[in-house]
């Protein structure tokens, strides 16, 4: 069996926002790739890998994935944090990649084999107003999508208003548009009414609330959009208030997809066991990789909850590959969010996931089936890149009085 000889973090994309983990072994040419990307704290994740996890694993048998996962999980003593789980997730994916290459099989075959011929996916349609949104939805339908996420005016979906139209106090904080919950509660049902009038019931829609509402208003929104038969409403309530999903479930039949910010098993376990959600939406890398997510999927299957692993603009092709291999093998798969990578980004990742119409197709090569051209990865960084000057905090929204809106 292959022994781990080194673990390297390869930064790529503009400003180094992607971190690809490369686990090397003592077998000639045998290595694995994983995703440990964190657009807001990339260097912190790299430090965890290089200073804590890599020294733990060098010399260990790469085949013992579960034992290595538990070793990484417990060796920092404090656990269940986003940065640690991202670091673990990147290494875990790489170990599964190695195992697939050793076996000569795609990872989904190691997870039990194919449950489906391809992976249904959804894209992101948006616009500053309903006219632009309808135009974008038409484009996605023409591309073959049957499920589409719809946002109007950003994550606020019509809830952002110009400052000159808002009642702003003196010495107001911030300078951009402000988020108004009542405007949002009016705009979103109206948006879906117009979309259904335009497109009928032949296409399914999702919408991302991004935890911008108070729990009571989230329940109101879920009730108001019921007539429009959403595929799901995403992250209606912030993780700090997940107990409110009990009240939401009692009052609305709108399907709920939850978990983009989840990293701790205690955040999803009760929601799944009490059947308060319909889709679990953790990010594969943030939850601890393939090993963690196959356990989440098994728990979810027992309680009738489906998977909808989170992707999004800051995710990389390796994370998407890991998600799709899970999707192929999980019976209770629901839908997969798709990433729209630039041509030059795809060019750096040979074997990236292919999309045809509304379906994703994994590589049939051994492992995750994806390879990184390190020269092209370096070129994606751009000129003058320096990890020491990187600073990219999440851009927060505010209400009219200056109160921060929780993302």
UniProtKB/Swiss-Prot annotation:
**Binding locations of D-arabinonate:** 210, 260, 281, 337
Listed PANTHER family: D-GALACTONATE DEHYDRATASE-RELATED, STARVATION-SENSING PROTEIN RSPA
Q: Which organism is it from?
A: Paenibacillus sp. (strain JDR-2)
UniProt-annotated binding residues for Mg(2+): 208, 234, 260
Q: Which family does it belong to?
A: Belongs to the mandelate racemase/muconate lactonizing enzyme family. GalD subfamily.
Q: Which GO terms describe its biological process?
A: amino acid catabolic process
Q: What is this protein called?
A: D-galactonate dehydratase family member Pjdr2_1176
Q: Per UniProt, which keywords does this protein have?
A: Magnesium, Metal-binding
| Disulfide bridges in this chain | none
Record GO terms (molecular function): magnesium ion binding
Cross-referenced InterPro entries, in alphabetical order?
Answer: DgoD-like (IPR034593), Enolase-like_C_sf (IPR036849), Enolase-like_N (IPR029017), Enolase_C-like (IPR029065), Mandel_Rmase/mucon_lact_enz_CS (IPR018110), Mandelate_racemase_C (IPR013342), Mandelate_racemase_N_dom (IPR013341)
Purpose: Has no detectable activity with D-mannonate and with a panel of 70 other acid sugars (in vitro), in spite of the conservation of the residues that are expected to be important for catalytic activity and cofactor binding. May have evolved a divergent function.
């Amino acid at each position: 069996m292959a022994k781990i000889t080194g673990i390297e973090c390869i930064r790529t994309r503009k400003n180094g926002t992607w971190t690809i983990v490369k686990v090397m072994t003592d077998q000639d040419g045998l290595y694995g790739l994983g995703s440990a990307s964190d657009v807001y704290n990339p260097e912190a994740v790299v430090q965890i890998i290089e200073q804590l996890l890599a020294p733990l694993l060098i010399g260990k048998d790469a085949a013992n994935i579960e034992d290595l996962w538990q070793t990484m999980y417990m060796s920092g003593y404090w656990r269940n944090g986003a940065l640690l789980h991202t670091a673990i997730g990147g290494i875990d994916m790489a170990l599964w990649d190695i195992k697939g290459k050793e076996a000569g099989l795609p990872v989904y075959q190691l997870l039990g084999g194919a449950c489906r011929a391809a992976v249904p996916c959804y894209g992101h349609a948006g616009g500053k107003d309903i006219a632009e949104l309808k135009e974008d939805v038409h484009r996605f339908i023409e591309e073959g999508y049957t499920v589409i996420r719809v946002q109007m005016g950003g994550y606020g979906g019509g809830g952002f208003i110009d400052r000159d139209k808002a009642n702003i106090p003196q010495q107001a904080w911030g300078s951009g548009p402000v988020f108004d919950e009542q405007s949002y509660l009016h705009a979103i049902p109206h948006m879906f009414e117009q979309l259904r009038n335009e497109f009928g019931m032949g296409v399914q829609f999702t919408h991302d609330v991004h935890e911008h509402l108070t729990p009571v208003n989230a329940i109101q929104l879920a009730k108001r959009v019921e007539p429009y038969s959403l595929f799901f409403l995403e992250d209606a309530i912030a993780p700090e208030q997940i107990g409110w999903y009990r009240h939401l479930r009692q009052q609305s039949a709108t399907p709920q997809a939850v978990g983009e910010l989840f990293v701790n098993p205690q955040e999803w376990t009760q929601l799944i066991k009490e059947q308060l959600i319909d889709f679990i939406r953790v990010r594969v890398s943030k939850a601890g990789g393939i090993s963690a997510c196959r356990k989440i999927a098994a728990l979810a299957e027992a309680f009738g909850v489906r998977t909808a692993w989170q992707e999004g603009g800051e995710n990389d092709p390796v994370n998407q590959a890991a998600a799709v291999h899970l999707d192929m093998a999980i019976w209770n798969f629901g839908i997969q969010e798709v990433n729209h990578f630039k041509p030059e980004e795809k060019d750096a990742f040979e074997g990236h996931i292919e999309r045809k119409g509304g379906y994703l197709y994994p590589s049939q090569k051994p492992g995750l089936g994806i390879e990184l051209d390190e020269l092209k990865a370096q070129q994606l960084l751009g000129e003058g890149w320096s990890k020491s000057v990187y600073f990219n905090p999440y851009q927060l929204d505010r209400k009219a009085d200056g109160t921060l809106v929780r993302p």
